[in-house]
Design a protein with these regions (language model features):
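Alpha-helical transmembrane segments of multi-pass membrane proteins
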Residues: 62-63, 355-360, 365-367, 377-388, ...
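Hydrophobic alpha-helical transmembrane segments corresponding to the first two to three helices
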Residues: 398-402
Length: 681
């Protein structure tokens, strides 16, 4: 297999590696969500074909957008869909009432609604509602132009209520009532899986997992915690303990990922400590699987403390011990509710520009397919709304996913129309043929955000070409051609407009986000290095925040790499520097974890002064990123009352900080190996 890959083009090899990673991704709840979506799709086809309900592709799209990873999230989205359906139909009837016989007025009214919806989609937390209203309003206004009878138009519009609401009811029955997937159960499964990984690292030597995966797992646990808080009363009552449990498991999973078990395999003094640590992890795992809080009386003896310090496990032991001794009824910190609207919604011109660009793209597509009298390519207008994203990089990503999904769906529809459809006689045979297509699309759609839209688009394109408004076999290949051409035209129009009209590049945002991540890391460095529970909980919370910030920066970096309107050399230089900052930020974090091990037993006032110097240097570097004026920090340590081991660990932190890229040089230069500055003893 590897020999065959050597002869393939590099982009194709990268694409294959990407799809292999996406298709093999495991996360709690993915298999149940896939099965729920698969069964829901088959039921929708059966119901729509039996009762001759039009717009089958739209009903399938409701399922793919609505069925989420857990019952609470699905219920929340279902409520949004009901609200969106009411707003959609209401806006359509207003358009018809005021401007049915006046195409220009009708287009202007629909354009105003689209403009407002796209603005709210960008500025409001519930952007999904306005996204749905935008699509229906701009497409629904074209019904009077296609049909000469107002009664038929009204009837089709009323059918849209059924088309949108009965899949919503179906997904509530399947996901919320009949086969509920609770967030708390998924959280317990995820925590136990992460503890399994951490415990195995204590005895088995293996290649460390990529840091990006570690950060994604940490973020997944934080998202699940939000759902547990909203859905589970017991979790909410003891939210402080469970939040500490989540951050503790994240810390163990991340730090033990780099633990080298082979380096201490022959050290007999460390073996009892590892066994004790494994038994404590197993006890915590058992309590979590039973949905209970965990209590432990473990106290590290002098021998265990010395062994833990020798192998770099002291901090892990102390943090695990603090969790075992934490009061489950500790009151949680007061939660802050985020605002519904973006703080700069009415001051930032990018929001209204975003809406205007989308409106212009839709109008160009509408005028084009109306002018050439090619109604079949109406998907070009819908594509302009679907691929509209706040920045160029994410828009290009969405365009690629939409094209890929449409291509796969069109190919499957073509093959089915030519080779399968002539042999079908009844609905059972049709469902048997559709089952594998829906299963594959459901598995893709339940993956990560990097590829999930391919599954949704594949099913919608396939349904538009083979199942839409026809309650029997279809042999018209023109439908497949029209849908594919419409999507391609919409992508081309959107790409041109978003690139040359008010392009929203993240090239300026990326250094600011990097500065924010390093600022959060500097805040972590200032946390008192003590064995007190409050200090350790603060440290763990900030540590998760650093993971999230660095992961966000890496995602922005990937999007900036797609912004071809930038100068190639400048773009590559920015991406390389940013990747270097992200990598060194991670290394500084882990180096500081090691320094925390030995620091807790020393005088805190002295350590705080030393930690402040590291934090000051890092914050100074972060402050210059926006202006590209950052140079590797210079740190001077004068204090002498410090242990040799801690001094060596702080030297490693200094070395990692010195390897941060120099943004004042015209090109990225290899990082210097020596620490810049002086460290005086």
């Amino acid at each position: 297999m590897m020999n065959a890959l050597n002869y393939l083009p590099l982009p194709l090899v990268k694409a294959l590696a990407f799809f292999r990673e996406e298709l093999s991704e495991e996360r709690p709840g993915r298999v149940p969500q896939t099965m729920q979506l698969w069964v829901g799709c088959l039921l929708v086809v059966l119901i729509s074909m039996t009762f001759e309900i039009p717009f089958l592709a739209l009903s399938l799209a409701v399922l793919f957008y609505g069925i989420q990873s857990n019952a609470f999230y699905t219920k929340f989205v279902a409520i949004l869909f009901v609200v969106a359906t009411a707003m959609e139909i209401g806006s359509l009837f207003l358009i018809y009432k005021w401007s049915y016989s006046y195409p220009l007025v009708r287009l202007i009214v629909a354009g105003v609604i689209l403009l407002g919806c796209m603005f709210m989609m960008r500025a409001h937390r519930l952007g999904l509602v306005f996204f749905a209203v935008a699509i229906v309003s701009i497409y629904g206004q074209s019904f009077p132009g296609m049909l000469d009878y107002p009664e038929v138009v009204v009837r089709l519009t009323l059918w849209c209520i059924v088309v949108g609401l009965y899949p919503t009811l179906l997904m509530v029955l399947i996901v919320v009532l009949w086969f509920p997937a609770r967030a708390a159960d998924q959280m317990r499964e995820a925590l136990c899986a992460r503890l399994d990984d951490a415990a195995s690292r204590l005895t088995q030597s293996a290649e460390p997992l990529p840091e990006k995966r570690i950060e994604q797992e940490a973020l997944a646990l934080q998202k699940l915690n939000v759902f547990c808080m909203a859905d589970d009363a017991d979790w909410r009552a003891r939210s402080a303990w469970w939040q500490t449990c989540v951050t503790t498991v994240t810390y163990l999973y991340a730090t033990l990922n780099r633990y080298d078990a082979a380096a201490f395999a022959k050290n007999q003094a460390i073996a009892p400590l590892r066994q004790k640590l494994q038994s404590e992890i197993a006890a915590l795992q058992n309590a979590i699987s039973n949905g209970e809080t965990w209590h432990s009386e473990w106290q590290l003896s002098a021998e265990e403390t010395a062994a833990a310090r020798e192998c770099g496990l002291e901090n892990a032991c102390q943090i695990l011990r603090q969790l075992g001794q934490m009061d489950p009824d500790t009151p949680p910190a007061p939660a802050t509710k985020p605002p519904s609207m973006a703080p700069d919604a009415f001051t930032n011109p990018n929001y209204i520009r975003y809406a205007l660009k989308t409106l212009l793209a839709c109008m160009i597509c509408y005028v084009f397919y109306s002018g050439v009298d090619w109604e079949g390519i109406h998907t070009c207008m819908l594509t302009c709304i679907i691929v509209a994203n706040p920045n160029l990089g994410s828009s290009y990503q969405k365009m690629t996913l939409r094209f890929g999904g449409a291509f796969c769906g069109a190919v499957l529809a073509l093959l089915m129309t030519i080779f399968v459809m002539p042999w079908l006689d009844n609905i059972v045979e049709l469902l048997l043929v559709l089952a594998p297509v829906f299963l594959i699309a459901s598995w893709i759609a339940t993956g990560s955000e990097r590829s999930s839209y391919i599954g949704t688009q594949m099913v919608v394109t396939f349904a538009l070409a083979t199942l839409e408004n026809a309650f029997g076999p279809i042999y018209d290949l023109a439908e497949i051609r029209d849908r594919a051409f419409g999507i391609m035209i919409g992508i081309v129009v959107s790409a041109v407009l978003y690139t040359f009209i008010w392009p929203e590049s993240e090239a300026k945002t990326l250094p600011q986000k990097l500065a924010g991540a390093l600022g959060l890391l500097g805040k972590l460095l200032r946390v008192p290095r003590q064995q007190e529970a409050a200090a350790q909980r603060t440290y763990l919370q900030l540590r998760v925040g650093v993971h999230a910030a660095l992961n966000s920066c890496e995602e922005i970096c990937e999007r900036v790499a797609l912004e071809r309107q930038l100068d190639d050399d400048q773009r590559l230089l920015l991406v390389k520097r940013s990747q270097a900052v992200i990598q060194q930020g991670r290394e500084i974090l882990y180096a500081w974890d090691a320094a925390w091990n030995d620091a807790q037993a020393l005088d805190n006032s002295l350590l705080q002064e030393r930690a402040g110097r590291f934090a000051d240097a890092l914050e100074k570097y972060a402050a210059g990123l926006a202006a590209a004026a950052s140079t590797p920090p210079i740190i001077e340590l004068i204090d002498t009352a410090i242990s040799p081991t801690l001094y060596q660990q702080e030297q490693r932190v200094m070395q990692q900080m010195a390897r941060l890229p120099d943004w004042t040089r015209p090109a990225l230069t290899p990082a210097e190996e020596q620490v810049q500055g002086a460290a005086q003893l």
